[in-house]
Amino acid sequence: MTMKKSNILGIFVGLFIGLVTVLGMSLFIFINLKFNSVYYAQHIPHKEGTDPDVIMLMENMGWAYTPEIEGISYDDDGSYSITREKGTKTSVLDLTGDTLFFHSESNDRYLLNRNFSVQHAFDKRYHTIKYNQRKVQKEIRETVQPVIDAQPKPLINLQWLFNLALSQQMVDFDEK
């Protein structure tokens, strides 16, 4: 009888250790993918004109590395935004839900969808203005590039898993 009890106890201990190991590995993978999402997004195949690294930075700003950089400030209370001050000029990129808001150095304002297509463009008096899509994307890139450049390389690189997990999401960005 004691042999059966010890076998059953051994099975339960083995299952418990296995469960804890799987949960620990899952937690590590989740944290790794979130914390390094900007780095991974820089290296994921994507259609030209889409900026998955900028999207990952804005979506995961609470997880991603946001170093102290002169002229850059972060706001993550309610929405995620990055402000860049360059001399007397200021630009702000903000993500709320699925909408990006960009306030350019020239005081123009743009509402963009997640694949960086401008939906609306306004001047400082909120009159509709004409815009150049590439110029707006370039200005957005200039606003956040110092933060993207500061992202560390992961200690354990799970690029393949990031690509697998987000490849469909990136395809969806490209098609919208």
Identify the function of each model-found stretch.
Residues 1-24:
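N-terminal Sec-pathway targeting helices
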Residues 4, 10, 34-36, 40, ...:
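N-terminal first transmembrane alpha-helix
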Residues 22-105:
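N-terminal export/targeting and maturation segments
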Residues 68-176:
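Extracytoplasmic electrostatic interaction patches
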